[in-house]
Amino acid sequence: MFAAGDLVVYGGEGVCRVESIGPSGLAYDGGDKVYYHLSPLYRGGTVMTPVDTAVLMRPIISRDCALKLIAALPALPEQKPAERGMRAAKDFYHQLVLRCDCAELAAMIHGICRKRAWALRHGKKVSQMDERYLKRAEDQLYGELAAAL
């Protein structure tokens, strides 16, 4: 269980600070469930999630892990879908983003950037889906690295 003040990675929200732990305070909630009250670091708003949620929630990486990851970036293999096709790529990228693993996100960014560079050299464009998942992966990875460092 996390404590108030902890920095956590919560699903698609990215890095959040645990503001408090307690009942939701909403009228339709019976008050029998305990919630984390989270504040995303890089956007406004508040997120309430049950303590026993199935959504991925983990502490941010340590400063040492962040520095090791940055040092290992040139050697990371690119992450790309095993199968061809838009649907396979979308499912592959979606699963990587949901896992919130920094090394996998960095490898995914590397793969999409290489794909973009190849497309530019050949007068083509990268798909909107690739651009959308690249943005999500960059936001998650860079946000967590910034919070850790």
What are these regions (language model features)?
Residues H37-D52:
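A short macromolecule-binding patch
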Residues D52-L149:
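Charge/polar-rich, low-complexity and marginally structured segments
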